[in-house]
Amino acid sequence: MAFEKTRQFLPPLHFVLFPFMAQGHMIPMVDIARILAQRGVTITIVTTPHNAARFKDVLNRAIQSGLHIRVEHVKFPFQEAGLQEGQENVDFLDSMELMVHFFKAVNMLENPVMKLMEEMKPKPSCLISDFCLPYTSKIAKRFNIPKIVFHGVSCFCLLSMHILHRNHNILHALKSDKEYFLVPSFPDRVEFTKLQVTVKTNFSGDWKEIMDEQVDADDTSYGVIVNTFQDLESAYVKNYTEARAGKVWSIGPVSLCNKVGEDKAERGNKAAIDQDECIKWLDSKDVESVLYVCLGSICNLPLAQLRELGLGLEATKRPFIWVIRGGGKYHELAEWILESGFEERTKERSLLIKGWSPQMLILSHPAVGGFLTHCGWNSTLEGITSGVPLITWPLFGDQFCNQKLIVQVLKAGVSVGVEEVMKWGEEESIGVLVDKEGVKKAVDEIMGESDEAKERRKRVRELGELAHKAVEEGGSSHSNIIFLLQDIMQQVESKS
């Protein structure tokens, strides 16, 4: 109530949101936009036309419900940066070299965005920017407004990055990329290899310059929003908040703002399967009998590895949903699925989704009893929020951090056994890391009837209940949104 009373005596807050052009970054940012708009904040999302089209339907429903959200388009300078037309999203890139060009294009957005901001009404009160868009720091400075960073990762990961950026000597002392080390001052004893942590010392050349810009912009930002909740990783939230002088607001799981079926089904993109067809298939299966398999929107595993995954799923003799991403690998895999007889042999107990999956809708169905995931933070949270135990198959980035949080700290899943980081564009040379027996073993471990499996399921269900409580009135995440808005209101008031 105190917040609402304060709200009446000030001009409306206007937050400008800058999502990075990658599906895993855009999805939670759109959720954050809706959560803030539900509190009476005017929201402007700045993105490119291609990326805006991905969340058009979800936002249109939000706008029709009375929320003050608008989307401003800026042209993506693909040609000037050496990219092909349509390469406006990381989904369409397949190498680290192209990513360098992509970041070059991103930084070219500074001037058109500056002009856009000059014309915005009402005057922006605050920027929320993805960590990967350091140019927004210059925008915030130019207009004398606070910039809040959104990373899209866990506090577990953020704390490890914060500590290691200030203790470079630990990584420099390692004799090889495969040698394990402990992160000092960490709440739990967790070992990493050098490549399993996302720190700027792992990069050189153009990539080091990109990372330096991002870290510097992060260090000078006003604060950080994290898509997590207090009861999930309390020690890491506490330590990271202290490291950032208190300006950290954990407001997740933001996915829980998706209440209706359409929002769940279309979160991130239009689903490649009819919602009713998907639900009908799940309704025909026993409770907790289905394994859901999705390795993310940027999975470039070689065909040989995908074949082993498929054969492992077949060997489990359990019903499964397998999401197969688009692109070149899809055509190769689709050919194998058809010609090898895999689809025919498993058709009575499998559902293959070729493209974007209605993941939230699937995970929240009672028939789903396990989730084989790449450990992207969005997917990790969606699985935990739905009370579904996880099988971890990390590929790169923060995903190895998330695996260790899931398996070692939360004890909410089991690892499929992957410890080697996939280097973008070099997947074929890495080859097969998990054979079909390894896949079957992990699935049986997570979905079996051992005491450990039962305890794990109980633990994940409890975490799922805590996730829902966090976003309800009086919950930690619900309260943190109020604290965030009060903080920004005080900033506005001090300048008026």
UniProtKB/Swiss-Prot annotation:
PROSITE patterns: UDPGT (PS00375). The keyword ATP-binding does not apply. The keyword Protein biosynthesis does not apply. Keywords: Glycosyltransferase, Transferase. UDP-alpha-D-glucose binds at residues 297, 357-359, 374-382, 396-399. Pfam families: UDPGT. It is an enzyme of class 2 (transferase). GO terms for molecular function: glucosyltransferase activity; UDP-glycosyltransferase activity. Its EC number is 2.4.1.-. Belongs to the UDP-glycosyltransferase family. This is UDP-glycosyltransferase 73C2.
